[in-house]
Structure formats: C-alpha cells, structure tokens
C-alpha cells in the first residue's frame, strides 16, 4: 500500500509542477486585467468607523458617513414609484418567469412511499409591460369587489410570479399587505388573519384545500378568498359566508373599462406597505409593520452592496416571499431590470426531490447569475459535494484536494485560480447553472467552512448579510472584495449600528481587543413596531432625541478594527448551567453542524442541570453505511433508536467539538437521534431553517426527561 501511494505521489508531481508554471505565467496578465491590486486595497481598507471617539458610538459605512441613505432612485420614495420606474425603463424586457409543467408521475420509493415527480419545460416569461397590465387589472378588480385603500389584504401562498404581482398591486393601490409563511400551521395562520383583520385573502388551491378549509370557521374577518391557480374548485365544499374567486376572474373583472378607468389611490412614504408576520421561531408569530419609507431605505442599502446589478442579471426566486430577505431581493431585482425565474427547494437542482431522474432542475435551465440562500441550503450543497469527493478514487481525490487547497490559498491572498475553475470546479459550479456571479446568504450565520467551500467551488463571492424582519432585512452585508469568513460585513449605507453592554453574558463595549455587546440598529429602515403589540414594541424599539428609530436585536456582536461586524452570540441562546458556566447553544450547534454524520442539530441545556444534551437529525446515507459496518440491522427508525449508533454520533460530536475548541462543559454528552428530518412543514424549524427551540423542546420532552434522568 505504501509503495502504491509513493507511485501515485510521483505521478501527481507533474500536476504540482503544472500549477506552479501556470501560476507564474498567468499571474502578471491576470493581475492587471482583473484590477487585483485595487480589489485587494478595497478588501483591506476601513469599511466603517464610529461616529465619535466615545465608547458605544454607532458605526457607519465610510462611503456614506455624513448622513444615512434613505432613497436610491430620485423621486421613487414609495414602492409603487419603484415599480412604475422599472416598467417605464424596461418595458418589453423579460421580467417574471415560470416553468411549464409538462407532466406529473408517481414514483414508488424503496420504503413504499409514493413521491410525485415533475417533468418541466422551459421558462415562460412575462415582460414588464405584461406584469404592469396584470397589476392594473388585479387592482381594479379588487377595488370593484369592494376593497378600500388602507384596508388590509393577506397573502398566504407559495413563492411564485402571482405572489409578486399581488404584492405590486397592493403597493400601487395602497392596500397594506399582510404576509404569512406558507408553512405556518393552522393556529398561526388563524392568529395572523384574525389579528390583522384582513377581509381579503390570496392563496393557492393546494393551501386552500390542505390548510385553510378546516380553519375557515375560526377566521372572523375574511370574506373574500382569491386563489392564484388556473384551476377549478368545488365551492360547495366550503362554508357559507365566503366568496371564492380565481385570480384570473378578478383580473377579468378589473379589465372592464368602467373599472379600469378608476385611478388607484396612491400611497405616501408614511403609509403602511406590509404587515409581515414572523416565522415564530421564539413563539407566536408577530406582525412587523413596515412603511413604504422603511422598505425603500432598506433596499437602498442592500442594492449598494451588489455591484453591477442590472438587466444582464437573472435571479432565481425560491425562498419564501413572506421572508424579508427574499421579498426585498426580488423587488430590488425587478427595479433594476433583472429577470426573476421562479423555483422551489423541491425543483431547484437536477437532484431535487420533485425532479424526475434524467430531467433538468430549475438552476440548470435558468442559469441564474444571482441567488439568495439560507445557510442550511449551502450546508447541504457542501455535504453532498464532499460526499461525492470521498467516493472518488485516490488520484481523483488527490487532484481535487490539490486544486482546492491551491485556490483556497489564492483566495486568501485576494487572487483567483482560473485553471482550477476551468478544470476542477466547472462541474460543481454547474450544479447551480454555471453562471452564478454572486450569492447572498442570510437568515442565520454561515459557517466559515461552508463559506470557503462556496467561494472555491462555485467561483463567486458570498455576500453574507445580517438583518432582521424588524430592520426590513437591512443591517450589514459583506463587500464582494472581502473574502474573510465568520463576519457579516460593515453597516449598510442606510443604517448605523451600535453595541450596548450585556453584563449578564459578559460582553461590554470596553472589551479588548474589540468592543462587544448587544447589536442595536438605527435608521429609516427600522420598521414601525409590532402590530397591535405596544408592550413588545416599547421593549424592543426606541426613538432617540433626533427622531431616529432604533431596534435592539438580542444578538451579540463584535466590531473588528476595519468596521466589520461579527455575530458571536444570542441572548436567548445563553443558558447558565448548575455550576455557573454559561453555554451558548447557537455556538455549540454552529461548531458541530458540519459533522459528516449530522444533517441538523439542536443543543439543549437546563439551568438546574450540569451538562448539555442534543437532538440530532443524522445523515441517513452515512449513518446507514456505518450501521452496516458495525453489524447493526433494521429499519431507519431502528438504526436511529440503537444505542450503538447514538454512541457513534457522540464520538463524532466529541471529535468535532475538540477540533473547534469547545469547552468541556459545552460538549453534549447525550443525544437523541431523529429519523425524521426537521423541515418547515414539521413546525420544528422556520422557513429560513432556524430552529424553533420551544417546539423542539415540546417535541422531545420525554427524551429530555430521559436524558436528564427523569422517570
């Protein structure tokens, strides 16, 4: 075996030599053609600084230091004006695209379950003028049905072109839009609809039949239900008192000259644009009130961090439009003339679960240049690719490692490796269509390991952002020239960020070498508070002597010398153990989530106990293979319930924890393996795949009692 390895090493020597010669030959022309010197200078420069020398002073971007930006396009101070600007500028250009469903097939799985597989065609596009026509018709139709300006209308629907058309209609006709995640359970949906007093509801046939039908009698205000699909439904199956319309019929009503001739009642910057219900990661969903001016300011900051955003770009929309990251990203893309092709997590790639084997996923067909992703999705891509690498033979694996390490070294220097991109990473890059030039990550922290992998294998910068629903998604985003990891960038030009002491957690603005504390964001992008919840609004929001709004995030951050922010903790994730040690559950999870045997993990601790426990969704393929090697037989549920498999997971947890330098008391010493994945549909994670700790605790209550010695 040793002789074989030596021979292979000798064979691979020319590869090292080729890379060395190539680097020497290509470096000088590449250096000047790509303006690498300027990019390196941009990466190393100060990006934000405090407004004064006083500790705790807010940090601002150096590119807009004297004042905060509140508007991007002159005169476009409301969302409807942004829409009109885009329509007049890009008229006949492709705007919103949807793939045709050619056929559906039922496919039997080895476990006996039947999955529906899709065979999809090409994208069919509406241009800007066609979208505008549909918006006008739909708005006139809603008005004809009796909807008045400033009266709320709710949308409970999957991400699709009709969602965006409905939203733009509401912005233009001054109908405050109440947004609800399509994955919310019955109780949360009923709460949102009743609290917002929405009398009109936009939804899909699938959600109407699967979730709403049984909830309608509990909903007090809704009188009109509009479904977006071109399908027929049996209205007799629904309770009396509801008028059910198709979106097409409402548009046809609005297209009548007597209705279309009535001009819309346009909004002002201080009018309510959206009441966005959160995903409920910390309890019952809260409605966040966003004025037009809040969203305009937030998107002004976000767009500044995406250089070259324009008509040459194609964006793939698949995240929930009820999430502020996806909604502001799509509105920004629409404003700048980018095509938006719609997708879903189940059809995104060739390997996605709803794509029939041999058919093409949405990325392959659309070939997007821009996309947003939550870390959970990037983590899956990373694990899948690295799993394929482990299955390669020695030469292939070694070639990949040589190329990966070489490019990683170049990236850290601020350079690139075009030969590696062409020969090694082209196939990996093709997983997302091959043309992605920038990805935006948000919703949760992205691990440095996954961040580096995406940089290397997908050959593009990752704009890691930090923002909240309450800040209209705007806070920070890393610049494209900044290839550091573990940080979320400098404050956007629309806001300023300060830290305040959190003594209980041991974080202060006077900490050395860098100030640390709770992150507080200020600017016009800060929303107006929580809908019908003055107590919580007063707790989390404040207004300073200059009239500027601030939001206390509950996240703990650290400012680096160049003005970039790092998220280091979360107040609600900190638990004090029986012996007095503090454990950050989020920190533990982030350290262990990239273990090959682990798909997802939730750490848990109680203040009356002395140790941490965990719930783990194991990687089915890897754990099944390991079970075979250990002689463990049975179904997937049997494997997950086997103490020997729990021991193997705990062994990997200890190894990863030691490698990440976790303290002894931070390492989980007991584990419960979950055979079922945590998805938004299970109610155990949000649509951004954030853990719902309360729901997870309730779900695993008996296991918690068992692992802590309860009877």
Swiss-Prot record:
GO terms for biological process: alpha-linolenic acid metabolic process; embryonic process involved in female pregnancy; fatty acid metabolic process; lipid biosynthetic process; lipid metabolic process; long-chain fatty acid biosynthetic process; long-chain fatty acid metabolic process; long-chain fatty-acyl-CoA biosynthetic process. The modification Phosphoserine is found at residue 447. InterPro entries: AMP-bd_C_sf (IPR045851), AMP-binding_CS (IPR020845), AMP-dep_synth/lig_dom (IPR000873), ANL_N_sf (IPR042099). It catalyses: a long-chain fatty acid + ATP + CoA = a long-chain fatty acyl-CoA + AMP + diphosphate; (5Z,8Z,11Z,14Z)-eicosatetraenoate + ATP + CoA = (5Z,8Z,11Z,14Z)-eicosatetraenoyl-CoA + AMP + diphosphate; hexadecanoate + ATP + CoA = hexadecanoyl-CoA + AMP + diphosphate; (E)-hexadec-2-enoate + ATP + CoA = (2E)-hexadecenoyl-CoA + AMP + diphosphate. The chain crosses the membrane at residues 8-28. Its cofactor is Mg(2+). GO terms for cellular component: cytoplasm; endoplasmic reticulum; endoplasmic reticulum membrane; extracellular exosome; lipid droplet; membrane; mitochondria-associated endoplasmic reticulum membrane contact site; mitochondrial outer membrane. Its EC number is 6.2.1.3, 6.2.1.15. Gene3D superfamilies: 3.30.300.30, N-terminal domain of ligase-like. Catalyzes the conversion of long-chain fatty acids to their active form acyl-CoA for both synthesis of cellular lipids, and degradation via beta-oxidation. Preferentially activates arachidonate and eicosapentaenoate as substrates. Preferentially activates 8,9-EET > 14,15-EET > 5,6-EET > 11,12-EET. Modulates glucose-stimulated insulin secretion by regulating the levels of unesterified EETs. Modulates prostaglandin E2 secretion. It is linked to Intellectual developmental disorder, X-linked 63: A disorder characterized by significantly below average general intellectual functioning associated with impairments in adaptive behavior and manifested during the developmental period. Intellectual deficiency is the only primary symptom of non-syndromic X-linked intellectual disability, while syndromic forms presents with associated physical, neurological and/or psychiatric manifestations. AMME complex: An X-linked contiguous gene deletion syndrome characterized by glomerulonephritis, sensorineural hearing loss, intellectual disability, midface hypoplasia and elliptocytosis. This is Long-chain-fatty-acid--CoA ligase 4. The gene is ACSL4.
